[in-house]
């Protein structure tokens, strides 16, 4: 092969590699936009849950009662500055008579404050004021990107501090579902005021990285190693590391009593994650696995069993 020919082939390889690199970066950036941007979250291109799971959720009596509760109960929209100087928003259901009991209910990924009305109703009917924050990049938030609980944990702590500073003798229960559950666990790994009495996590994941390793290959037909490329794209675009975004590491530091709830038939976040989280938590803890429940379905298909466990657990720690 002549020298000039070798040079041409080498140059072609370099150009081809550069083009492939540009194409890969565009693909990864598109994935970030699809999964974590405001537009990707509010206008999803792919479904996380099966059609049956969605229909079961919509038709559950608990869901319907929650919708009726939201439509008939006075609500207050609250805005406070967070530690970044940005405005964060929440919906508050406030008891007509004075109550120091507060439930901070944290919604899931691609969900909303209204979608967790079935949780809000139960707490409100049990005498709690209920605060439901709008999570980053979801409807009602000013943020452009979601961090799957990692930076959201600081917003929840800012809400906790707001309640602590405005309500004398506040008793706070944290209750999150799916991404909201991971957020709650991430919160409990931080230093919290004594007004936080306990936490309830329902079908949360061990880490954002683990959640993506489980779901992205199934959703997009990609190999698991693609998650590492996605990880670096997220870090470049948004500035957080999905491996560091670990509920597992946070519960290892937690002093907040935590109840772990999960459906054993969960197709989005495997129940093995709940067992791993429970086994690693250093706080006072309890766990209940619902044998036939899919993702977020435990309180909808097993409502009596679910809430009996929640009240049994919370009553141990709330001030009498």
Regions found by a protein language model. Give the residues of each.
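Hydrolase active-site cap/lid region
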Residues: 186-240, 249
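Conserved alpha/beta-hydrolase
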Residues: 120-142
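Short amphipathic, positively biased membrane-proximal segments
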Residues: 1-35, 47-48, 124-126, 164-165, ...
